[in-house]
Amino acid sequence: MKHFCLALLVISSVMRANAAVIVVPPDYNSGGEPISGPFSQFSTPPNITSMRYQEVYASDQFSGINHGGGFITGVGYAIIGGGGLQPGGVIPKLQIDLSTTSKGPDGLSTVFAENVGADNRIVVGPKPVYIAANTPGDPTGFGVFIRFDTPFFYDPAQGNLLMDVRNIEAPGFVQSAGSFAGLNKSGDSISSVFAFNVGDATGIRDTIGMTTAFVVEPIPEPSTITLLTLALPLIFFAVRRKRQPTN
């Protein structure tokens, strides 16, 4: 039993050590500003019932991922300037895709399809998604947290990261705890293209983007694999010993 507990402790410590939160752009507190994005109450003007929003993130912002890439399991957003708004609301039908793209910040095409990479994967939905501050499991400082249904493998060495959001059935008023933290600065690590109709093939290009906290599970480094290799035999030995009949 002692060996079994020790092995579990080693494995759990390794997993906790591997988890990382990468914020893009990291300097949003200096010169940042509130923006609406595709999730908040200001996303859709009156009589507009859907939206498509793409945002690109420069690959050099993901240096915190070990060599070889990692799995993105969720995204967090910071709410700023609450202004007495409601605590949250449900977007009836939301879909989020991620892909690796050759397009860079301030270089997105106004044609949505031209920005999408070959490894495109649906990571959320399409389904109802609750958007509110202080979501359980949120990264510190980023209260709106969306956990992915399917992780996305991303290797920064292969290109920039594209997030593609389809707000398919957005009501005219989506409650929110406030505006989202973002950055509207040419030459930074993010930019976007958007349209107020999810079916539009083209959109409006803008240098603005939402500050995003990515939760990443990197591929274990060789030292981590060594620890796991040592721990697994301990578990096997403990389980086998426990099953042996006592005289």
Predicted features along the sequence, with ranges:
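Sec-dependent N-terminal signal peptides
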Residues: 4-12, 229-231
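Hydrophobic h-region of N-terminal signal peptides that target proteins for export
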Residues: 9-17, 235-237
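Boundary/junction segments of secreted and surface-exposed precursor proteins
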Residues: 17-48
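Proprotein-processing/basic-patch segments
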Residues: 22-28, 157-218
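A short beta-strand element within beta-rich, extracytoplasmic domains
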Residues: 70-82, 163
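Aromatic- and Gly/Pro-enriched, solvent-exposed loop/edge beta-strand patches characteristic
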Residues: 85-186
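A short, hydrophobic C-terminal helix/tail in secreted or cell-surface proteins
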Residues: 221-239
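C-terminal membrane-anchoring or membrane-association module
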Residues: 237-247
